[in-house]
Amino acid sequence: QVRAHQPINTDGSINLEAWLDHAVSVDLALDREALKEACEFARASEQQANAAKNLWSEGTSSFRTGLEIAEILADLKLDQDSLVAAVLYRGVREGQIELPAVSQRFGPVVAKLIDGVLRMAAISASLSPRQSLVLGTQGQVENLRKMLVAMVDDVRVALIKLAERTCAIRAVKTADDEKRNRVAREVFDIYAPLAHRLGIGHIKWELEDLSFRYLEPDQYKQIAKLLHERRLDRERFIADVMNQLKVELQAT
C-alpha cells in the first residue's frame, strides 16, 4: 500500500516545499517548479472558493487529495502532465477550477487528461446502489467496465482515476455508512478489476481489501482472523525449526 507523504506545518497546513522535495526524490525526472505552480494554483483555488475541508470524510479536501493522487502516480512513474492533472483534478471536479483555465495555464494535454477523468467519473456514477456485491447481473457490470476501457484513449486517464478512487476508499473510513458503502461498491465492482487489467497489483489488492472490509465486515473479520491464526502457526513452525537447527549446530 502506498501511503500519503504529506508533511504538516505546526499550524496544520501542508508543508508544500517538503512535499515537493519528496515527490521529486521519488522521480528525478519531475519538474519541481512546474509541479509547485500546479500545487499553489490548486491550493489558492480551494481557498478562494472557501471550500469545506471534508471531501469524503473529516479532514480531507480537494487540495490534499490532489497531492495524495499525485504521490500514487509518482510511485507508478507517470509523467509530469499526469501529476499536474492529478493535483488539479479534484479542484475541477468540485467547481473550484475551470477547465479552460487549466488548458491556458498548464497546457491542453493536462486539460484533456482531466476531462477524460471527468468522463470516466460520469459513466461510473451510473452504478446504482444495491444490496449485494453484484449490481443486476455480472454481465451488466462487465459491460460498464468495457465501456470505461473503450472510452479511454490514454491509459494515463485510467491511472489517474484509479489513484483518485484509491484515495477515496482510504478516506471513507470515517464517513457515514451510505457514503462509505457507495464508494466501496463502485471500487469493488469497477476499479479493482480495472487495476487488475492494467497489471497494477498493489493497487488492485488495496482496493479489494478496503472495499470488501466495508461491504462485508463480518466476513472480512472472519477471514482476517483465519489469516492471523495461520500466521501465528507459521511463526511457531519457523521458531521450532530454528531452535532445532541451533541444537543440531551446537551438537556438531
Model-inferred region functions:
Residues Q1-T252:
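Active-site helical microenvironments for divalent-metal-assisted chemistry
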